[in-house]
Every structure is written in structure tokens, then in C-alpha cells.
UniProtKB/Swiss-Prot annotation:
Gene name as annotated: CHS1
PANTHER family from the UniProt entry: CHITIN SYNTHASE, CHITIN SYNTHASE B
Glycan attachment residues as annotated in the record: 560, 801
The protein, known as: Chitin synthase 1
Lineage, broadest ranks: Eukaryota, Fungi, Dikarya, Ascomycota, Pezizomycotina
Record's subcellular location: Cell membrane
Length: 929
């Protein structure tokens, strides 16, 4: 960027602000090293940091510079590069400012609140002289929100003020000039449009002092797309908690690339009808509280124009601001490697204008409240056809958002859909060296290949992940959203006993997986026939936990929430009969009901099942046999093997008991190394069991299969498979149905690589899903974190006090910054936004939640007792008289039942996968384009 001027003060040419200008490829700042994994950014060659410089655009000099202000033609480009010296208007690069100038180069009686001076050796707005690059701290951000405040010890206020009329006497909505560099980056063909060019030259700020339900046109609130009479077809929502600027940029840049894919459609009969395609798409960012927000993320948003420092208001005449709403239409984007992308031509790689709504909530009130702002506040005004939900950090792949939308366009009864989420594996898949990442990668892949297609075939996908899903807005209106928002604690006083304060601990856990509640309510909506689907063409990439503590904490919420929500859907299945689904769909819903019941039962008894499987295999292989089938104990002989197996059993039990102790008394982050040791011990035991299982398979097939599996008649075949005459049939069926299906389905899905690099890790760690993750989850059933957290940052913000204007109008006095100051402050903002990212782990406060422990204890006792009872009943000699069978016979029968049941459930998943694959292929040929 550069100042466009005549070359000096009073040059006779008027100021028109900054112009986007690229770095000279031979300058000292052009050799920027990209973080690993970003070297192949498809638009990096067009970024601010990698192109040659262009000439000043003297034609566009305006008429806004006061004669007393110097007009400079120096380049700001170098100052945007990391480690660049500070520059201020009216001075050369690296020169010290006048003692009578503040950090923006504007004369005043005191230094501004922007942190360090230009001669301090680090950039404006705060910086670390040791690191040499800018960063944003909480204190510096708070200071920048009070640009008109006098410093300690006195001084004069800097800016003049203007009077802004409140809408209906209570709603504060103000337009602010954007920095000249942002305005000039918009392609002229959009800026020159009459009637709508204001969206490119001014950012709109609204201080919402109401509940999301009261954010209505009747109460004086409005949004730009509706003000311009635009139809919103697609509302893309990004929910944010505390992610860093790299994660947010990854999502934001991916969304803008996907919007470009939609705008570039040449043969579309829909998107190109009735106006430009970009006017039918709105991107909404909802940030869950100022306190948790990474302030460097706000610098990134300010760099592309959808946020400005110094405009937010703590309250409007005593009415507390609940949400700060910014609106702007931009063509700028920042990549995850902190490169600024701007339009250069009308080519297919140029980003189109994107309509942004940025909602910065004043307090942290959870994701479900963010969705209430999205659906009840913005959704009711914009009335979109489809809403796509993304979490900050999820990167949609090319044309993924288009793929989700096409699913709704081609199926009028589709109420919700989700795409394929896969783990981010790093450059060259290097993250797969971490066993936890590999296990989660396999889990995601199998879910996308077997589970989601099966549920899609039924018509009810039990969970559309909030990180990457979509809903038809009119489908979720009414009861689905009403039930969904019962979990919002900000409605607790209004809802009374129906709200979160009136819920028992079971229902509170259910709302930990609130997306499952919305899915069930949508399918069971009275009188309607909405169904849910999985769309293979839509893919999203997300980070997964890489440490044991983070992994356990994440799964605690997932497991408890999904367990409670699954029970909720089973108990309320009768509401399906009030829906409008046809008899065929209802038949498949009943099949899915039975399938889900079986899954819940197996999940409940999984702790005992894993223990029994481990001990049975050890006894079958390790104990010596006498008589006709005499054999020695393997692998260490008759004496050592039984003793070795007994020690392993005691270690197994000891570490299971240890998990209960850890879960009841410690947080995962406080016992990190103990949990890592537990993962290692269980994986070693599982590896030993896999070796013994392989030995069993070899022994079973030493007798020719033809002698064990008879095919003379159907009865003989069934007896040889399901009878007790031989083991080969059972083992063969188990191998094919459990493990063979994984390979077959993965190859048919044309995505088999996880079977080679992730499946071995999963085989080693699969017991930890029960012995560690589920034990921790059930022991922390009481841990439900609700409540609004106050914000010190919010308290430090300025207020908007109303006065009476002409004709008794209610007005607010607001500062009126000169364009030069806006542009100068923008320089520091961009420098902070494009600085290299340092990933520093932030310490978290201890969680002292101690309620609902009695319920938790009863649940754990019931679960542990029932599993122990099953294990004892199967293996103990004391039950021989009751069952008239020896414990070995009962053990063999249980083991056989377990294998057949697991194989049966796997076959059901495979059949659903085949149906989905066939339907997708057929629909691909006949779908409307």
C-alpha cells in the first residue's frame, strides 16, 4: 500500500488515502518463509508479500486533505512486512517522530494509547523487542477502544465529534469509513455501482442491547442484505470460541474460496438469475465473548475490513450491549500463512465480494447461544434457504459448500446434511506418526465410510456435526429450534422449569451433544417429512487433539452427550408417528431403532466384553491342554506362559481401577503423564492379544477347512458355522465380517490408505476407548459447565450516552476520525495481523465444579457392578450348579455370541454403505445442475 499524494506537504493534490501496493520481489522483506504445509497455497503468488511494486495511482487523488496536514507519498508496503521499522505520516522510514506528534503522526498534547513509540524499537500497538515482531495484548487492545480518552495527568481530547441519531430512539447503528487501502482494494466495477457502493466504503456497527429473540425489524434492528432488498440463499456461519488467527484464517479463507467457486459457475441456471451470485451469500461470524477472543484474530478481521478498533460501546445510555455487530462487504482475505490476498484482475482466481456479518458477543455464553443469534436474530431477518455451520479451524475443501447446497437444491425434502470431516495430517502426513492422531483419523474415516452412509440410507443421521453441517432454515423453524434452545442458559429465567436451571443432570448432559437433539427434532417434526443425509462430495478438514489430556477431555463431552442424546431419541421415538413420513421410511426408522438399541446395549457392557475377550484369548492359548487335543502353553511354555498371563491380567485390572481413581479425582491435564502411561500399557497388552489371536487363527486352519466347514447340505453348513464342532467357521466369519469389511468398503469407497497407516494404531489402542475414555466420561457425568462469564475487557469499553438533538431527536455523540488517522492506525493493525504466529500454550484455570456427584457415583456403581456381574457369571465356577454348564462352556458360548453379534452389526453397516453408494451413483446422473 502507499499514500497517494503529490510528494510533499501542500503539494496541491488532495488526499485519497492508502492504495494496495505489493512488495518488490527484490526487497529485503520479500523473502518470506512460509510455515510448513503452506508452500503450495494456490493464491500465494498473488499475495501482498510476493508481487512486484506498482506505480502510484495519481489519478485518484481526492479532495479531503486539510491544508494544515502534510500529504506524504511514502510507501507503507515495507512497514507491513514482519520486522519492518515503524513509519508515521510525514516522516521517512525509520525516522523518529516529532516530539509533538503522537504515534499516528498527528499533533496532540500527549502520546496516544497505541503502545510504544516509533523510536522504541518495536512496532506501534505493542511488541516484543526480543522477538522483533508485533503482537497484540489484552491491555493494548483495551487502550485502543478508547481513542478519545485523555491520558493520565491531563491533556486534550484529539477528535471532533458528530451527532448520530438513534433508530427508534434506542438502537445505535453507525457507519464508519473504512481505511482507504481496504476501500481502494475493491474492484472499481463494484465501487462505482450506484446505490450499493456504501457497503464497500463504510463499515456498519450496531450495538445490540437486546436478547437475540428481540433482534427484529419491529425493534429497529436491521441488516444490510435486507436493506438492499437482496434474497439470501446461503447463510454461512462460523462459530468461534478462542482459536488463534491461523485457525480462523484457515476457515475464513477456505470459505471465501468456496464462494468464488459458486460465483464462477458458468452454466448455473440458479445462481446467475436475478442478480450476482455473491449477493445471495452471507457469511456470519459469531464470537463467543470478548474475554476469550484472541485479540490477534480481531487484527486479522480489521485487515480485511470487517472490524475496527475504537467503535464498540459497552452500553447505550445504561442499556448493556449484548452483542457488537459489524457489517462490511470485502474482497480481501488473509491466508493461514498470514499473507494478504487482494483482487488483481477479473480472472477466475480473483475473490468476489463477500457480505460479512461479524457478531462479537460481550460475554461468553456458549455455542448454543451463538446459534440463537444466528437463527433467531440474523436468520429471521435474512430468511435464508440454507444455513451452513462451520467451527473456526475447519477448512472446507474446494467446492464443498456448493456440494452441500446442491444436496438441498436436488431434494426438496432434505432438512439437514453433513459432509465428510477428516483429520488434518500435516505436510506429508507427518502427524500420523502420533498414534492418537492416527487413531482419530481411522475413526473419522470409518465413520464416513460405514456409519454415516448407513444412517443416510435410513434417512436419520443421528448427529450432524456442528463443525461442518447444513440445515434448511424453514425445516428447523418452530419446535426443532425451540427444543434445541432449551439448553441455552441465557433463557433459563424466561423458560423456568423447561430451561437449563430446571433440568436434571441427565438432560444437561444431553445438551452437551445439542446437535443430536436438533437432528432428532427435525426428523420427528409433526406433520413434516424432513430427512437427513450424508453428502460425500462435501469435505472438511479439521484439527484433532494431539495430546492425551486434550483427547480425553474432548471425548468426555462427546461420549456423555451422545449417550444421553441417544437415549433421548430412543425414549421419544413415538413422536415419529406424528410426522409425515411414508410407510417405507417409517419401516427403516424401526430397523434403525433396533440397531441403535443393540448398539447402546453393547456400549454399556463393553467394559466387561473387553476384559472377557482378553482373558479368554489368554486362557485358550496359554493354558496347556491334555488328552486328545493335547498341546503346550504358548508362547513361553507350560510353566511360564500361565504365570505371565496372570501377571498381565492383574496389570490390566490394576490400570482399569486406576482409571476410575484418576477420573474421580483428577483432571486429564493434571495427570498427563499417568494417562500417557495408561495408553502405553493398554496398547502393549492389546499387541500381545493380537499375537495370540494370530496364533489361534493359524491353529484353527491347520485342519483343512473342508473338514471343518461342510457344504453337503444347508443344515450341515449352518451347523459347521454356528455349531460347536469346529472353530474355523467362527473365526473365518469374524475375520471377514469385522476386519474384512473395513478393507472391502474402504477400497470400494476409493479411499483405502487409512487401512495401511492408521488401522494398525487403531488395533493397538481400541481397548483404550473403553478402558480410558469411557471410564473418564462416565465418572465425570456431573461435569456440566454452564453459566455466563463476565469480562474485564468489556467493562473497560466506552459507553454511548444519549442527548437531545434538534427537534428533540435522541442522538449520541461519536468521534469523527479524519481519514488520515484511520489509515495510519490501519498500518499498525496490518503489521500485527501479518506477523508470524507463535503458538504458545496458555494455562487454563482449574475447574472447581463439584455438584451432582451423588448422581455420578450411582451411575458409575451401576455401570461397574453390572459389568462385573456379567464377567463373574461367565467365568466363575460358582455358577456351574445354576447353569448346569462348566464355566469354560459358558465362556465359549459367550465368546461365540459376541463374535456373531459384532459380525451382524458390521454386516448391517455394510449393507447401508452399498445402498448409499448405489443411490449416490444414480443421483449423480439425474441430479439437476
Amino acid at each position: 500500500m502507499a499514500y497517494r499524494g503529490a510528494g510533499g506537504p501542500g503539494g496541491g493534490r488532495d488526499y485519497d488515502g492508502h492504495n494496495m501496493q505489493d512488495l518488490n520481489p527484490h526487497s529485503q522483506y520479500s523473502n518470506v518463509q512460509l510455515p510448513p504445509g503452506h508452500e503450495q497455497e494456490d493464491e500465494a503468488h498473488r499475495s501482498l508479500l510476493t508481487q512486484g511494486t506498482t506505480l502510484y495511482d495519481h489519478d485518484r487523488l481526492g479532495a479531503h486533505t486539510p491544508p494544515v496536514r502534510p500529504v506524504s507519498a511514502y510507501s507503507l508496503t515495507e512497514s507491513y512486512a514482519p520486522n519492518a521499522p515503524t513509519t508515521v505520516p510525514g516522516s521517512a522510514v525509520g525516522a523518529s517522530p516529532s516530539p509533538f506528534q503522537n504515534d499516528y503522526g498527528v499533533s496532540s498534547g500527549y502520546q496516544g494509547a497505541m503502545g510504544g513509540h516509533a523510536d522504541d524499537g518495536f512496532p506501534i500497538g505493542g511488541g516484543d523487542p526480543q522477538q522483533g515482531h508485533p503482537y497484540d495484548t489484552e491491555d493494548s487492545w483495551v487502550q485502543r477502544q478508547n481513542p478519545n480518552a485523555a491520558p493520565q495527568g491531563g491533556g486534550l481530547k484529539r477528535y471532533a465529534t458528530r451527532k448520530v441519531k438513534l433508530v427508534q430512539g434506542s438502537v445505535l447503528s453507525i457507519d464508519y469509513n473504512v481505511p482507504s487501502a481496504i476501500r481502494n482494494a475493491v474492484q472499481p466495477k463494484y465501487r462505482e455501482q450506484e446505490g450499493t457502493n456504501e457497503e464497500f466504503i463504510k463499515m456498519r456497527y450496531t450495538a445490540a442491547t437486546c436478547d437475540p429473540n428481540d433482534f427484529t425489524l419491529k425493534n429497529g434492528y436491521d441488516l444490510r442484505p435486507r436493506m438492499y432488498n437482496r434474497h439470501t440463499e446461503l447463510l454461512i456461519a462460523i462459530t468461534y470460541y478462542n482459536e488463534d488467527k491461523v485457525l480462523l484464517s484457515r476457515t475464513l479463507h477456505g470459505v471465501m474460496q468456496n464462494i468464488r467457486d459458486i460465483v464462477n459457475l458458468k452454466k448455473s441456471t440458479f445462481w446467475n438469475k436475478g442478480g450476482p451470485a455473491w449477493q445471495k451469500i452471507v457469511v456470519c461470524l459469531v464470537f463467543d465473548g470478548i474475554e476469550k477472543t484472541d485479540k490477534n484474530v480481531l487484527d486479522v478481521l480489521a485487515t480485511i475490513g470487517i472490524y475496527q478498533d475504537g467503535v464498540v460501546k459497552k452500553d447505550v445510555h445504561g442499556q448493556e450491549t449484548v452483542a457488537h455487530i459489524f457489517e462490511y462487504t470485502t474482497q480481501l482475505s488473509v491466508t493461514p500463512s498470514q499473507q494478504l490476498i487482494r483482487p488483481q484482475d477479473d480472472g477466475p482466481n480473483t475473490l468476489p465480494p463477500v457480505q460479512f456479518i461479524f457478531c462479537l458477543k460481550a460475554k461468553n455464553s456458549k455455542k448454543i447461544n451463538s446459534h440463537r443469534w444466528l437463527f433467531n436474530a440474523f436468520g429471521r431477518i435474512l430468511n435464508p434457504e440454507v444455513c451452513i455451520l462451520l467451527d473456526a479451524g475447519t477448512k472446507p475443501s474446494s467446492r464443498s459448500l456448493l456440494g452441500l447446497w446442491e444436496g438441498f437444491y436436488n431434494d426438496k425434502d432434505l432438512g439437514g446434511a453433513c459432509g465428510e470431516i477428516h483429520a488434518m495430517l500435516g505436510k506429508g502426513g507427518r502427524k500420523l506418526l502420533n498414534p492418537l492422531v492416527a487413531v482419530q483419523n481411522f475413526e473419522y474415516k470409518i465413520s464416513n465410510i460405514l456409519d454415516k452412509p448407513l444412517e443416510s440410507a435410513f434417512g436419520y443421521v443421528s448427529v450432524l456435526p456442528g463443525a461442518f453441517s447444513a440445515y434448511r432454515f424453514r425445516a428447523i423453524m418452530g419446535r426443532p429450534l425451540e427444543q434445541y434452545f432449551h439448553g441455552d442458559h441465557t433463557l433459563s429465567k424466561i423458560l423456568g422449569k423447561k430451561g437449563i436451571e430446571g433440568m436434571n443432570i441427565f438432560k444437561k448432559n444431553m445438551f452437551l451433544a445439542e446437535d443430536r437433539i436438533l437432528c432428532f427434532e427435525l426428523v420427528a417434526k409433526a406433520g413434516q417429512k424432513w430427512h437427513l443425509s450424508y453428502i460425500k462430495a462435501a469435505k472438511g478438514e479439521t484439527d484433532v487433539p494431539e495430546g492425551a489430556a486434550e483427547f480425553i477431555s474432548q471425548r468426555r463431552r462427546w461420549l456423555n452427550g451422545s449417550f444421553a442424546a441417544t437415549l433421548y431419541s430412543l425414549m421419544h421415538f413415538g413422536r415419529m408417528y406424528k410426522s409425515g413420513h411414508n410407510i417405507i421410511r417409517m419401516f427403516f426408522f424401526h430397523v434403525q431403532l433396533i440397531y441403535n438399541i443393540l448398539n447402546v446395549i453393547f456400549t454399556w457392557f463393553s467394559l466387561a466384553s473387553y476384559w472377557l475377550t482378553t482373558t479368554v484369548i489368554m486362557d485358550l492359548v496359554g493354558n496347556p491342554q491334555v488328552g486328545q487335543n493335547a498341546r503346550e502353553g504358548w508362547p513361553f511354555g507350560n510353566t511360564v506362559t500361565p504365570l505371565f498371563n496372570a501377571v498381565l491380567k492383574y496389570i490390566y485390572l490394576a490400570f482399569v481401577i486406576l482409571q476410575f481413581i484418576l477420573a474421580l479425582g483428577n483432571r486429564p491435564k493434571g495427570s498427563k503423564y499417568t494417562y500417557v502411561t495408561s495408553f502405553f500399557v493398554f496398547s502393549v497388552i492389546q499387541a500381545y492379544i493380537l499375537v495370540l489371536s494370530g496364533y489361534l487363527v493359524v491353529q484353527a486352519f491347520q485342519t483343512p477347512i473342508g473338514e471343518q466347514i461342510k457344504t453337503d447340505t444347508a443344515k450341515d453348513f449352518m451347523d459347521s458355522i454356528f455349531g460347536k464342532s469346529g472353530a474355523a467357521g467362527v473365526i473365518l466369519l469374524a475375520l471377514i465380517a469385522i476386519y474384512g469389511i473395513y478393507f472391502i468398503a474402504s477400497f470400494m469407497y476409493l479411499d483405502p490408505w487409512h487401512m495401511f497407516h492408521s488401522f494398525p494404531y487403531y488395533m493397538l489402542l481400541m481397548s483404550t476407548y473403553i478402558n480410558i475414555l469411557m471410564v473418564y466420561a462416565f465418572n465425570n457425568w456431573h461435569d456440566v459447565s454452564w453459566g455466563t462469564k463476565g469480562s474485564d475487557s468489556n467493562e473497560a469499553l466506552p459507553s454511548a450516552n444519549i442527548t437531545k438533538g434538534e427537534k428533540d431527536e435522541v442522538v449520541v455523540e461519536e468521534i469523527d476520525k479524519p481519514q488520515e488517522d484511520i489509515d495510519s492506525q490501519f498500518e499498525a493493525t496490518v503489521r500485527r495481523a501479518l506477523a508470524p504466529f507463535n503458538d504458545e500454550e496458555k494455562p487454563e484455570p482449574k475447574d472447581l465444579e463439584d455438584s451432582y456427584k451423588s448422581f455420578r457415583t450411582m451411575l458409575v456403581v451401576l455401570w461397574l457392578f453390572s459389568n462385573c456381574l456379567l464377567a463373574v457369571a461367565i467365568t466363575s465356577d460358582n455358577f456351574d450348579a445354576l447353569t448346569k454348564n462348566q464355566n469354560t462352556a459358558r465362556t465359549a458360548s459367550f465368546f461365540q455370541f459376541l463374535l456373531f453379534s459384532t459380525a451382524f452389526l458390521s454386516l448391517i453397516r455394510f449393507i447401508g454403505f452399498l445402498w448409499f453408494l448405489g443411490k449416490t451413483g444414480i443421483m449423480c446422473c439425474i441430479a439437476r445442475r
